[in-house]
A protein has these predicted regions:
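Extracellular/lumenal mature domains of secreted and surface-exposed proteins
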Residues: 437-535, 676, 698-699
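Edge beta-strands of extracellular beta-sandwich domains
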Residues: 87-104, 518-531, 670-671
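A general beta-strand register signal
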Residues: 9, 133-134, 471-472, 617, ...
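Short tyrosine-centred short linear motifs in exposed loops/low-complexity segments
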Residues: 33-35, 75-79, 189, 213, ...
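Acidic/polar, compositionally biased interaction segments
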Residues: 504, 522-523, 528, 533-699
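Conserved structural position at the C-terminal beta-strand
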Residues: 83, 511-513, 659-661
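Extracellular/periplasmic carbohydrate-active domains that bind, remodel
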Residues: 1-439
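Short coil/turn motif common to extracellular beta-sandwich-like domains
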Residues: 31-36, 449-457, 600-603
């Protein structure tokens, strides 16, 4: 269990680092006040390209010194620490669980079992009325089986490590039988689970509840990873409900939460068999992450069941799955395709932060019965602080009563379908868009362009009786409606700003009304501000140009973007923007060269999106490069959309631009967005591109 990938100390005292699954490690310790945390990576240069500490809402930014990072943690928290953009199934990630001390063990009695610290190779099979207390440091290699029991409590601070015998190449994890999940239940009632860590190394559904009711999970930590990167949901309901999940952490390799009426395999008979209702689920105050798929997935093609009263609130979406499995992945993916049947209502998503995410909502209900389908879905106070959506949202079919109430990207509230963006089709009713009603978080700053050490004045929009808290993305914070701040460096919040000579800082504003947070009387705003450490001068104004870009085509069967300096283009041309004519080739790399016209001096962020692989270079500096291709699954063609960004300090005028894009299995050219002084996040317009004119003299 012990990991050598990281060395961790808390207030100078070493803390054991354990290996979880895949390339994930974790540490767990208790705190009673603020602490200083030090993390040293075994790999040389591990942190050189940056550090990403989530949830972003906390505004944590470490100090980096070689292989070591250090940061201050003010209160108990569950953190994910990795390198920027590295959060998929092969990512090297460290999860830090800083908790409050557990309750003392219960008094001895005939129905009380105390499991001491150490290794125990056996499953837990409590009977009705039993209490099991796992001491800190107790490791159970097995399962927690809750079959036809009631009144069970599992308390303490122990760990269950599940290493099952499931086929790693397919889904056998759906089966409902003992020793098949970290926690498995059937027809169980009134169960309390507190302080438990689940490590899941097999390709199985991590926590499965069939026809079970009145479960409460508090301070649960679930970490799953498997080579197939699939079928390892965080928590599934097969009928039942009445569940509360609070103050918990999930890292899944499939949907974090799955809701079905039943699941007895993939045969025609099993898929078409009607399932039982799922009702009354509350998930709150939790951190949610997956390497693939959705955060919440109710429904499946052709399945019949109903569900009501699901709430996810006051939580952070650290990592959403990218790509698609028949349906694009999202915060909510409701896949009621191929004549699924049922009524699903009263789903609420409230006070949620979207850190690394893909799309907001995908809802499809292809139903031909008289049931009312999907209705009463509310998305309220959804804050995406620092990344745009990578895919459109969709409402399709028998859907009504969808409301988007203060869905906010940075400082901008979505008030139209185009703002999300959202496609409504096949009879779905148009959604309602609303803006915040009580307090509003919105701010301005001056000057619009600044460098290291310069004073920046921040002014929040006034809300009567509100309190204002600023997190500047450099590890510092302030209170008050109007504050001043100096940024001490140009490395950015993620310490990834050195290459371009400028760093992007994620500035957050939290506004709380008179009645306090958690009541709907709060709002957040965010903006990425670029601190310029080094200016890039514009090209000579004497250069004569033509509109558009030049391009070259490099045929090849690459699976990742190659080093094109070693390749030979077969033909070339010019185009208005990032388009090219491959002249019949279907697998190739394209290169575009030219100039990009910067409208004003300032710190700019460039956002790069592409499916097969792309690279953006400005003034000879690599600004962004998307990650390796990530295949979509379940028959969805092509690769998922990948994303990267970078910041630069650019003088007004023309700057050289070089773009590379691979075309292997997906359609579409790279997309480049920019933002800067008085320039909101938007696609770089065609008019910004040009290339140097070359006159040819003929005799």
């Amino acid at each position: 269990m012990r990991s050598t990938a990281f060395t961790v100390s808390v207030n100078g005292q070493p803390v054991d680092v354990a290996h979880a699954a895949a390339s994930y490690d974790w540490v767990s310790f208790d705190v009673t006040g603020p602490v200083e945390i030090s993390i040293t990576a075994a790999e040389a240069g591990f942190w050189d390209k940056g550090v990403d500490i989530q949830p972003w809402r906390l505004g944590i930014r470490p100090v980096r010194q070689g292989k070591t990072i250090r940061f201050h943690l003010a209160a108990p928290a569950k953190l994910s620490i990795s390198r920027p953009g590295d959060f998929l199934n092969n990512a090297a990630m460290l999860f830090v669980f800083a908790g409050t001390p557990p309750q003392p063990p219960p008094r001895a009695g005939p129905h009380v079992t105390i499991i001491a610290a150490g290794i125990h190779r056996e499953s837990l099979n409590p009977k009705s009325g039993d209490t099991i207390y796992l001491e800190p440091g107790a490791f159970i290699f097995g399962s927690l089986n809750l079959f036809k029991v009631g009144g069970v409590k599992v308390l303490g601070r122990g760990t269950i490590v599940y290493e099952g015998t499931q086929d790693p190449t397919t889904d056998e994890g759906w089966m409902q039988k003992p020793d098949w999940h970290c926690i498995g239940s059937y027809d169980a009632r009134n169960v309390q689970i507190e302080g438990l860590t689940c490590i899941v190394r097999a390709r199985t559904w991590s926590i499965q509840m069939k026809d079970s009711f009145q479960f409460t999970y508090d301070d649960l930590r679930v970490i799953g990873g498997n080579p197939g990167n699939a079928n390892q949901d965080g928590m599934d309901w097969l009928g039942g409900g009445g569940t509360i999940v609070r103050n918990s952490f999930f890292r899944a390799s499939d949907d974090v939460f799955g809701i079905q009426g039943n699941w007895d395999g993939y045969t025609e008979e099993a898929i078409l068999a009607p399932g039982k209702d799922v009702t009354d689920i509350l998930v709150e105050d939790s951190e949610l992450s997956t390497s693939i798929s959705n955060i919440v997935r109710p429904g499946w093609p052709r399945k019949t069941f109903s569900s009501h009263n699901f709430t996810l609130r006051n939580s952070d979406i650290l990592h959403g799955g990218i790509g698609a499995c028949g349906e694009t992945f999202a915060l909510l993916g409701f896949w009621g395709a191929e004549h699924a049947h049922g009524e699903h209502s009263d789903y609420t998503f409230e006070n949620l932060f979207l850190d690394d995410w893909y799309s907001l909502v995908q809802m499809e209900m292809d139903q031909d019965s008289a049931l009312p389908g999907l209705h009463g879905f509310t998305f309220r106070n959804i804050w995406a602080p620092d990344q745009p959506p990578l895919a459109d949202s969709n409402l399709s079919g028998d859907i009504s009563g969808v409301a988007f109430d203060n869905v906010k990207y940075g400082q901008t509230v979505a008030t139209t379908d185009a703002d999300l963006p959202l496609i409504v089709s096949d009879g779905a009713k148009a959604p309602i868009f609303e803006s915040p009603k009580n307090v509003v978080a919105k701010f301005s700053f001056d000057p619009p362009v600044f460098g290291v050490g310069q004073v920046v004045r921040f002014t929040a929009e006034a809300s009567l009786g509100a309190k204002y808290t600023w997190l500047f993305g450099d590890g510092t914070e302030a209170t008050g409606r109007i504050v001043s701040h100096r940024f001490a460096d140009a490395e950015g919040t993620m310490l990834d700003g050195e290459a371009g000579g400028a760093g992007r800082f994620r500035v957050l504003l939290h506004v709380v009304g008179k009645t306090g947070s958690g009541t709907g009387n709060e709002d957040w705003a965010s903006q990425g501000l670029v601190v310029v450490g080094k200016w890039r001068e514009a090209a000579s104004s004497a250069i004569q140009t033509l509109p558009g870009l030049t391009w070259q085509i490099f045929p090849g069967n690459w699976t990742e973007l190659p080093d094109l300096t070693k390749e030979q283009a077969v033909f070339n041309g010019q185009s208005p923007s990032l388009s090219a004519n491959p002249q019949g080739f279907v697998r190739y790399a394209a290169v575009w060269d030219g100039l990009i016209d910067i409208p004003a001096d300032g710190g700019y962020t460039f956002h790069l999106l592409d499916r097969d692989g792309a690279r953006l270079v400005i003034d000879g500096v690599q600004v962004a490069r998307t990650g390796p291709p990530f295949a979509q699954v379940c028959g969805s063609p092509g690769n998922a959309m990948r994303y990267d960004r970078g910041a630069m300090g650019l003088r007004a005028g023309k700057h050289t631009i070089h773009v590379e894009g691979l075309h292997s299995v997906s359609e579409g050219a790279p997309a480049i967005y920019w933002e800067g002084p008085a320039l909101p996040l938007t696609l770089v317009p065609v008019t910004a591109y040009s290339y140097a004119r070359k006159d040819v003299v003929t005799r």
